[in-house]
């Protein structure tokens, strides 16, 4: 778990949620620096959450952000399991339907931004509704 110094100088532990929010904010800034436009963050639909929704041209991008301190056990990218992919697909499907769209009518893709230690990896089109 990451730590942050307090005003008194002694570190305090961040919650898992705070750590995740910090990495998601960093991923958002990083993607915006690459030219993507922010749409939404922490989108909850029945049974799942999408960390970031971005836009690149006419493409809607659903982004999963992952952080791991080290590359042990495959690093951050390897933690996006088949089960997690399925949940993300379902959540995106519900979000699209809420916004009058579907995988058939909206150009979209699923990206992963993986932070492993000090390294960042952007996996474009990491998976899709046909995988």
From Swiss-Prot:
It comes from the Bacteria. GO terms for molecular function: nucleic acid binding. Pfam families: UPF0102. InterPro entries: Restrct_endonuc-II-like (IPR011335), tRNA_endonuc-like_dom_sf (IPR011856), UPF0102_YraN-like (IPR003509). Gene3D superfamilies: 3.40.1350.10. Disulfide bonds: none annotated. Residues 1-21 are annotated as: Disordered. Transmembrane segments: none annotated. Residues 1-19 have a biased composition (Polar residues). NCBIfam families: PRK12497.1-3, YraN family protein. Belongs to the UPF0102 family. This is UPF0102 protein YraN. It comes from Escherichia coli (strain K12).
């Amino acid at each position: 778990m990451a730590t942050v110094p307090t005003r008194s100088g002694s570190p305090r532990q961040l919650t898992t949620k705070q750590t995740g929010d910090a990495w998601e904010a960093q991923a958002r800034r990083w993607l915006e620096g690459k030219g993507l436009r922010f749409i939404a963050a922490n989108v909850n639909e029945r049974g799942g959450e999408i960390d970031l929704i971005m836009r690149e041209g006419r493409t809607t991008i659903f982004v999963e952000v992952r952080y791991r301190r080290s590359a042990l056990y495959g690093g951050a990218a390897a933690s996006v399991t088949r089960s997690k992919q399925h949940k993300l697909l379902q959540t995106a499907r519900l979000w699209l339907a809420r916004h009058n769209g579907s995988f058939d009518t909206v150009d979209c893709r699923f990206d992963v931004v993986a932070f492993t230690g000090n390294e960042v990896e952007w996996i474009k089109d990491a998976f899709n509704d046909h995988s």
